[in-house]
């Protein structure tokens, strides 16, 4: 949706939202898994990702990610998109097939939470 409606390259749109997934993709008992990997595998993978980034938890990785995005000028607020008036369209416009490669399933409520917190 960010790509097609607002003319962003796919990678730009992903970069703007990616920081929120450091926390979201840490499995807990309430989250459903996409694919055949189990929660233990995903948790271990996320912790390894945190270590590769030089941190030990999702919050520090998210903070680092968005500081980096700010330095290079990739911020959601710079897009001129009014989240309050466009959030439903943003959520409806997400390609569900692209979400299948995320290890944790996402629904419209999850997307709303992520977009609200950008």
Task: Label the model's feature ranges.
Residues 83-118:
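Short, amphipathic C-terminal "tail helix"
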Residues 4-86:
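Gly/Pro-rich interdomain helix-loop hinge
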